[in-house]
């Protein structure tokens, strides 16, 4: 075995080991000193590339992405050197400009949202009334009603992931079965929405109702591209969907106390792109462009499930500050939830893979 080969193996193993612990590098920045050297940034860049299996088309693209990475790292360092309620860090999107990030990963269509706001029936089921005795805290992950975090990839299908997540949860709450369902079926078959180019929750819910159910992820796996609609089983069904009273965080809290709810938010800021941990407090606007799911709350924040994989945020989650009214990033402007009768036997048919919940699978805030 050649010496060169042995050295190559050792370098690979070393880079792999460092990449797995890249978080220890992220915050070694002291604002009182000069910023990182190019050599230090290049080392961090190489470790980050290894961790996320990034491969570029050539040297020109590699250098272009390095410059973007360097700018983002400086932005992250400067934020973390100040007094904030949350930290930013290296995410899978640190080699993207904010404009590129928005174009690829934000997929809730604001044009559709504005049309639907005038037509959707808002339920008074979760209208907040003085004297309502709500739990001080709730976390549906702890109750085994949430599947592991998923990853939408380079496809603007957040609308499908957030809708499916709430259907998975209400099905578990009503039947006791936690089943991972198919986002790809919605991307391929829900023609009122736009596949990887965005969509709306209500059209996704209506498709599941009209279709008589939705298939499992195992039967109809995710591809991150829109393809032809193919035959699918009707494993889990819902009865309907309702809107929570708009711009009322107390009503939203009441809804989440009963079941996870889908919401649209403004996720376009650089701070959101690079969020790593803590209670996110902005900045952000109220232009709704990304679908997520509220799976719980604490006294001053929401526990929000994203669909960008476990390397973003707190293992795929973000804690967002509760501010009242329409909420931070517009989180209370357009909340919905699916409805399903208790004891619906349909969701117990043809379900070969029930998920076993374990606390290790979820980073509890």
Swiss-Prot record:
Subcellular location: Secreted
GO cellular component: extracellular region
Disulfide bond entries: 155-196, 189-229, 247-326, 284-329
Regulation of its function: Repressed by the active-site-directed cysteine protease inhibitor E64 (L-trans-epoxysuccinyl-leucylamide-(4-guanido)-butane) produced by Aspergillus japonicus.
Tissue specificity as recorded in UniProt: Laticifer.
Organism superkingdom: Eukaryota
Active site: 158, 290, 306
GO biological process, one term: proteolysis
Broad class of where this protein is predominantly found: secreted
Any one Gene Ontology molecular-function term assigned to this protein's record: cysteine-type peptidase activity
InterPro entries: Papain-like_cys_pep_sf, Pept_asp_AS, Pept_cys_AS, Peptidase_C1A, Peptidase_C1A_C, Peptidase_C1A_papain-like, Prot_inhib_I29
EC number: 3.4.22.-
Glycosylation sites: 83, 121
Proregion span(s): 20-133, 342-365
Family to which this protein belongs: Belongs to the peptidase C1 family.
PANTHER family: CYSTEINE PROTEASE FAMILY C1-RELATED (PTHR12411)
Name of the protein this chain belongs to: Ervatamin-C
Biological source species: Tabernaemontana divaricata
């Amino acid at each position: 075995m050649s010496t060169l080969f042995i050295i190559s193996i050792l370098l690979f193993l070393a880079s792999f080991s460092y990449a797995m612990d890249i978080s220890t590098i992220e915050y070694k920045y002291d604002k009182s000193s000069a910023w990182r050297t190019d050599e230090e940034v290049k080392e961090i860049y190489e470790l980050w590339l290894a961790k996320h299996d990034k491969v570029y088309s050539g040297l020109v693209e590699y250098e272009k992405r390095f410059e973007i990475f360097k700018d983002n790292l400086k932005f992250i360092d400067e934020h973390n050197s100040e007094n904030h309620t949350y930290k930013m860090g290296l995410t899978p999107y640190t080699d993207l400009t904010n404009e590129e990030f928005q174009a690829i990963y934000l997929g809730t269509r604001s044009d559709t949202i504005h049309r639907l706001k005038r037509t959707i029936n808002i339920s008074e089921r979760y209208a907040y009334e003085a004297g309502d005795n709500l739990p001080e805290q709730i976390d549906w992950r702890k109750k085994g009603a949430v599947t592991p975090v998923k990853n939408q990839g380079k496809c603007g299908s957040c609308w499908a992931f957030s809708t499916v997540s709430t259907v998975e949860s209400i099905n578990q709450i009503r039947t006791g079965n936690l089943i991972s369902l198919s986002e790809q079926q919605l991307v391929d078959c829900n023609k009122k929405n736009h596949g990887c180019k965005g969509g709306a929750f209500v059209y996704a819910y209506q498709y599941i109702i009209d279709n008589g159910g939705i298939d499992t992820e195992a039967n109809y796996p995710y591809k991150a591209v829109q393809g032809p609609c193919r035959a699918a089983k009707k494993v889990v069904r819902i009865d309907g969907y309702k809107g929570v009273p708009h711009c009322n965080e107390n009503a939203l809290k009441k809804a989440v106390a009963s079941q996870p709810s889908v919401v649209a938010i403004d996720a376009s800021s650089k701070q959101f792109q690079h969020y790593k941990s803590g209670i996110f407090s902005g900045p952000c606007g109220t232009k709704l462009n990304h679908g997520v799911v509220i799976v719980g709350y604490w006294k001053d924040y929401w526990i929000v499930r994203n669909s960008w994989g476990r390397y973003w945020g707190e293992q795929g989650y973000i804690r967002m500050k509760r501010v009242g009214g329409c909420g931070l990033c517009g989180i209370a402007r357009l909340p919905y939830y699916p409805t399903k009768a208790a004891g619906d036997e349909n969701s117990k048919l043809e379900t070969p893979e029930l998920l076993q919940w374990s606390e290790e699978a979820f980073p509890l805030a």
